[in-house]
Amino acid sequence: MSIFNKVTKSFQWGDKTVVMETGEIARQASGAVLVNIDDTVVLATVVGSKQAKPGQDFFPLTVDYIEKTYAAGKIPGSFFKREAKPSELETLTSRLIDRPIRPLFPEGFYNEVHVVIHTISLNPEVDADIAAMIAVSAALSVSGIPFNGPIGAARVGYVNGEYVLNPGQTARKSSQLDLVVAGTEAAVLMVESEAQQLSEEIMLGAVVFGHEQGKVAINAIHELVRDAGKPVWDWQPPAKDETFIAKVTALAEGKLRAAYQIRSKQARTQALREASASVLESLKGEGVEFDAVKVEALLFDIEAKIVRSQILAGEPRIDGRDTRTVRPIEIRNSVLPRTHGSALFTRGETQALVVSTLGTERDAQRIDALAGEFEDRFIFHYNMPPFATGEVGRMGSTKRREIGHGRLAKRALVACLPSKDEFPYTIRVVSEITESNGSSSMASVCGGCLSLMDAGVPMKAHVAGIAMGLIKEDNRFAVLTDILGDEDHLGDMDFKVAGTTNGITALQMDIKIQGITKEIMQVALAQAKEARMHILGKMQEAMGEAKTEISSFAPKLYTMKINPEKIRDVIGKGGATIRALTDETGCQINIEEDGTITIAATEAAKADEAKRRIEEITAEVEVGKIYEGPVTKILDFGALINLLPGKDGLLHISQIAHERVEKVGDYLQEGQIVKVKVLETDDKGRVKLSMKALADRPAGDSGRPAPAERGERRERRDGGASEQQQQ
């Protein structure tokens, strides 16, 4: 009899088999499910506190996605040989899981919930993020924690005009789309994607396709819950004090309505603070006992009702616009004098100072991912300091939100970057958000494109982004173009679309409610396209095309090709040759396995010198050609002459002069510069040289020693021997 009460469910999902297990591992967690998809194994655990902390006024959900290096048969490369802080991929996956599950916890549920996902086995062809989302959905569903799930999730590719379910790494190389969608049976809740300039129709079709495929996982989770689910918690939302709500509403509504007639964000925020303080003072003055946290929550609800009702009634939005108008746009290029490329993009009260820097291949980011190492030559970083929203705050390590916004902007731009062959630079773009009132990530896309073009990057097309919002009550809804920060907080959807005049390059959607239909998404996409075209027009006016020359402060890249067999000659013993080249020419030199050499230099003359020296090193000695070089070594039977860098030839004693040479040192000295002709080379690379082939033959010299000469020499040799004998 086993001590485990193990329950297993398996199902076929496209061409993959999915197995879900619970009851054996991590039994003390509120819920734990192991998901195996073709050898990619993920363990998701969830623990919920039975009681909320006193004074808690928000839902404290934490999602931690962790990849274990042993999952891919690796040992961590750090000094301590253990997993350290989360990688960028782990942070992004944590956000990907958090976004669709957060709206499904009931309103007023403020108990702490911690979701931890471990990837413990990885098949490189099966992404762990989809397995993790299914495992989390199942773990929450069996835990008994109040949760209006389960959710399903799927990855969608687009290959040869057809949608592909959960494509692996290999299939994605030929796919025009990488889209992840998550949602319940009834509605889509989250979309994250990048695309190769695809139409709105294709993108919407991918969302619908992925949502339908996700329902297969939802059905399997329902079966798992039926056999292994724990009792649902007996949790009820706190009872509402209607009398107190009416009291606060009476005190606050007029002041809040007046505040939302103010168009400036700073002035409006100040008016809202004063309204809140006034309500608290009035309650104190009347002797009413209250919890300040609850009062603030009530004020937020009143604000939401005011703003939402005004928009649905067709009244102007918070800043006076209608639902389709984009805020005023100002663009300035080449803002910073010594950077490689820069742009200041301002849209209303949202502003991004975006800077592009060009580097060499050595500057590429080397990423040691679980599925394998690779180099990333396009880096995008997004920073948003507290002053951007007029707040006091701490400056510290990069936050999850900043990593997520940077990745979204990168997804939007990467489809329009030139290939490595066209533009071999490593590119880093940094977006500094200097003002923020909604849609700063999309301002980063616009500013990023302009700064890249300012840096001389030949972009395939201008790329612009826009954030859309939604207000929905029953059957009435309004789609909002270019949402403000307040409209984001008070609305039902955050829908970001980036692309070119030809199509969409990135799409991100987060929906806070259920019931968003395909028709609503169609309206949102059509309205987003209209706004995108408007912004693209403004960008094209400011910068019609990329600069034809890169900044004088950026490194210039020059490429050349050598025989791959000559690579070791350029590198030299222990790297001595390549080090000398870089030190003496002031260039960076990168050599690839196929013999492609990239020279990075700030001046053309330095690059030319490096190229000349590499050509010398890699040049082949030609038979019949005359070379001039120093004598490097004197031998008894000849001398070694340096013809090319690292290439010597043998000048035999018989080839030094037409007359007989008794001693090489009588004719040559080390360091002496001589002219020689190449007589022949053999298959081992040995070179035979001649000096006498270049010298005029003495008059009457047949080239053979005369008999008398030969006799005299014999006599001298004989005489010498006799003298020795006599002695």
Curated annotation (Swiss-Prot):
Top EC category: transferase
The name this protein goes by in its record: Polyribonucleotide nucleotidyltransferase
Subcellular locations according to the entry: Cytoplasm
Designated gene of the protein: pnp
This protein's GO CC annotations: cytosol
Entry's Gene Ontology BP terms: mRNA catabolic process; RNA processing
This protein's UniProt keywords: Cytoplasm, Magnesium, Metal-binding, Nucleotidyltransferase, RNA-binding, Transferase
Species: Acidovorax sp. (strain JS42)
Domain S1 motif: 624-692
Binding site for Mg(2+): 488, 494
